[in-house]
């Protein structure tokens, strides 16, 4: 009876025992434990779905355990991951992983400019992209507008205190009598957008100066904002205009 209990205890111990820790030495000669969660997030950043990223991470980890090495260089993990992605999902996915790893090692900040009309999903997309890419700094142009409204009263700058699509109502009288309603709305939007371009430029320039990634989103993000950015910077700047092309009925 005692032998049976001892055997059961031994089997339970073997089952519950934590897998060995695998140490990873990076390019700066620093040693950290291999993290499956970090590896999984890295693969998600490459555009893999949650299921595909989990599958690839699991297979890479199994290969590391089978190798039996207590410490490995980070380059070997990259090589194993590249091979695993190629076998599971094809060469394009594996190449995308290499591109992402090259970018993360470059130290270049990523600036995403998300523009689009109200209700098209800018904030939702910004939140999801920030999570996937590990970007901690996001900024809404609506919040910048609220700060400006606190600083500048309505009687001095009424166009700032309307919504972007009703800003035309605060245009000077000589302009507000134009017959073309669409042109009026566009002129009002551009007028408010130009006012918001000042704090938007400040936010972007600070991110470039501190070399941190940033997502700037809002209706005031316009293609002309690219002219405000010093192209001598080595940041990766991606302007994106979001639209709902087919409305559900």
Predicted regions and their residues:
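Extreme N-terminal, non-catalytic leader segments
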Residues: 3-8, 49-111
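Conserved nucleotide-sensing/catalytic segment adjacent to the nucleotide-binding pocket
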Residues: 149-212
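Glycine-rich phosphate-binding P-loop
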Residues: 111-133
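ATP-dependent NMP and nucleoside kinases share a basic, alpha-helical "lid"
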Residues: 208-249
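Short, surface-exposed, low-complexity cationic segments
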Residues: 36-54
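Residue-level preference for the first positions of well-ordered beta-strands
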Residues: 109-113, 213-215
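Short beta-strand-centered segment that lines the nucleotide-binding/catalytic pocket of NTP-utilizing
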Residues: 135-151
């Amino acid at each position: 009876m005692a032998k049976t209990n001892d055997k059961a205890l031994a089997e339970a111990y073997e089952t519950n025992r934590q897998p060995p820790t695998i140490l990873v030495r990076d390019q700066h000669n620093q040693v950290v434990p291999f993290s499956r969660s970090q590896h999984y997030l890295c693969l998600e950043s490459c555009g893999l779905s949650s299921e595909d990223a989990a599958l690839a991470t699991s297979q890479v980890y199994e290969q590391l355990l089978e190798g039996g090495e207590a410490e490995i260089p980070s380059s070997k993990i990259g090589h194993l991951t590249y091979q695993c992605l190629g076998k599971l999902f094809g060469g394009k996915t594996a190449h995308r992983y290499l591109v992402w790893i090259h970018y993360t090692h470059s130290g270049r900040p990523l600036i995403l400019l998300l523009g689009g009309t109200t209700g098209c999903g800018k904030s939702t997309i910004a939140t999801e992209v920030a999570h996937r890419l590990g970007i901690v700094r996001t900024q809404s142009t609506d919040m910048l507008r609220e700060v400006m409204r606190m600083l500048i009263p309505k009687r001095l700058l009424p166009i700032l205190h309307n919504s972007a699509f009703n800003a035309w109502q605060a245009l000077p009288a000589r302009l507000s009598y134009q017959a073309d309603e669409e042109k009026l709305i566009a002129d009002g939007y551009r007028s408010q957008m130009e006012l918001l371009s000042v704090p938007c430029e400040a936010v972007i320039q600070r991110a470039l100066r501190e070399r941190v990634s940033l997502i700037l989103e809002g209706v005031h993000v316009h293609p002309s904002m690219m002219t405000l950015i010093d192209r001598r910077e080595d940041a990766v700047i991606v302007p994106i205009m979001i639209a709902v092309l087919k409305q559900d009925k």
